[in-house]
Amino acid sequence: MQIQFIRAVQFSLLIKLDGRLREFNFRKIRNSEVETFSVNVCNERGDRIFFDMKKQDSSWDFTPSNLPGWIEQNKKVIRQAVEDELPNW
């Protein structure tokens, strides 16, 4: 009997957006043909915002598309933070 271990990738990043430091939690979804992360972050009221990031053609796409403006306006910063963190995993 052979045991196979599959690493669960999960990390948090503090990213400064619009003058506020926000904690983004990332969890890599296994069993996916496309590299995908489930992401959650709190807004100003403490409500959790959930979305997915999928790697398509060397760029990260965000789903759903109806995200708050402060996420929409800072997608480039979030993408870069993820790209900087991934080599550590």
Language model segments and positions:
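Extended aliphatic helical segments
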Residues: 9, 34, 39-41, 77, ...
